[in-house]
């Protein structure tokens, strides 16, 4: 027969496990939102080049290089957020894709001007790198991003009003002041 202390300990242990699972679920959802933000930004600002977009403790961010020198404004953030909501409503799926020919993918990124993605892929080419594809209901790829994942199965897991773009800040590529200053959009979900 277990003692009261052991029973309480087990309850606490189960609670901690459940909270860790909830935190991981939230991290995956936020990371998926960062991809949706990148997709929205590239639709509205085709000159935008993608750097990185992880989930962080209180939300997520994505770093962009607007090659025409445009600086994101509050009005831009409103438009990006609205486009994100439109993307979410489409019930798009996220699909993991193992890159079969890494050198070819690096060349494609370079041809598209996606120098940051090319640099990251070059660095991780021996790690079985993957893209995450965002697809519509007919299987058409609408967006792809270099990413290890994981992601939510589809955008219906996100409530459109549960995302909020917060601010723009400068961020040096890879945190190195000798590198180019990018624009980081912070958000939460």
PLM features: residue spans?
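Active/ligand-binding-proximal structured segments within catalytic/core domains
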Residues: 27-45
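Structural signature of FAD isoalloxazine-binding scaffolds in flavoprotein oxidoreductases
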Residues: 54-56
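Generic serine detector
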Residues: 2-3, 32-34, 156
